[in-house]
């Protein structure tokens, strides 16, 4: 038993070390990003002034037509994505009869799909075309219920990879558009602060809702359908608003 514990500890230590190395590499790569040349006025260090400034920035980004669309999408995506990571584990164990380690490979398949989708979006979608991918949000929501009919792990790998691919291709242009509007309206750092608050609030809210549904013994099938319905409903509203903004008034 002690030997097994030591082996497990070695695996955890190695995993943590690998994560630290990756974070270090990411931090080092930031050193090679060229500065924009812009010089911003110093920010006040008074707490109330900081809060008031943050609230003004928050409203500026949410009231901007393109800013609100891209912020809505990225906020939704990260909340759904975090919930989906846990849901995939439960689904794989209950419906595919995989153990936890095997189920984690489906999370890896999703990550591979996201990376591939992000790379394709960076190659094929220009900034002025960013809103063209909004329909993929509906597609992602429509793909989720397919999980209910999957019974083989091979099919599950293909489906989770496809979900990641669609998600990566969908969110990267939206994130680029959000960063662009943030720089135009505010500054890079201030817009990222607004984005992080919204996305983390979305993750917390959806994790709380997911935990609450589990507490009341909701079935995996019901959780999948709720997540799909949320994705489709929000994206339909975002698309409708975007179409209204594009349609010239009479």
Residue ranges and their predicted role:
Residues 138-152:
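C-terminal ends and interior cores of transmembrane alpha-helices
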Residues 71-72, 104, 134, 189-193:
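Conserved glycine-rich helix-kink/hinge and helix-boundary motifs of the Major Facilitator Superfamily
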Residues 1-3, 69, 77-85, 110, ...:
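Substrate-agnostic recognition of the 12-TM MFS/MFS-like secondary transporter fold
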Residues 1-19, 90, 94-96, 204-227:
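Transmembrane alpha-helix termini and helix-breaking/packing motifs in multi-pass membrane transporters
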Residues 35-72:
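Juxtamembrane intracellular "pre-TM" segments in multi-pass secondary transporters
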Residues 3-17, 59-116, 155, 169:
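A single, central transmembrane helix in multi-pass transporters
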Residues 12, 16-46, 239-249:
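Helix-loop junctions on the cytosolic side of multi-pass membrane transporters
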Residues 3, 116-130, 214:
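Helix-to-loop junctions at the C-terminal end of transmembrane segments
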């Amino acid at each position: 038993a002690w030997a097994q514990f030591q082996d497990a500890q070695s695996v955890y230590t190695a995993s943590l070390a690998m994560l630290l190395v990756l974070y270090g590499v990411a931090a080092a790569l930031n050193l090679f990003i060229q500065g924009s040349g812009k010089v911003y006025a110093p920010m006040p260090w008074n707490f109330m002034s900081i809060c008031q400034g943050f609230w003004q920035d928050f409203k500026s980004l949410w009231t901007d037509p393109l800013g609100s669309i891209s912020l809505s999408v990225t906020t939704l995506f990260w909340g759904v994505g975090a919930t989906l990571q846990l849901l995939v584990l439960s689904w794989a164990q209950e419906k595919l009869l995989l153990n936890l380690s095997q189920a984690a490979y489906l999370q890896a398949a999703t990550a591979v799909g996201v990376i591939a989708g992000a790379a394709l979006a960076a190659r094929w979608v220009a900034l002025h075309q960013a809103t063209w991918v909004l329909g993929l949000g509906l597609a992602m929501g429509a793909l989720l219920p397919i999980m209910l009919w999957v019974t083989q792990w091979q099919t599950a790998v293909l489906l989770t990879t496809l979900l990641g691919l669609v998600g990566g291709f969908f969110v990267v242009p939206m994130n680029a558009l959000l960063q662009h509007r943030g720089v135009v309206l505010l500054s890079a750092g201030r817009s990222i602060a607004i984005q992080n608050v919204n996305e983390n609030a979305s993750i917390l809210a959806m994790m709380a809702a997911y935990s609450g549904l589990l507490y009341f013994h909701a079935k995996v099938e019901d959780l999948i359908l709720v997540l799909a319905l949320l994705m489709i409903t929000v994206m339909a509203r975002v698309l409708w608003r975007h179409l209204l903004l594009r349609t010239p008034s009479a």
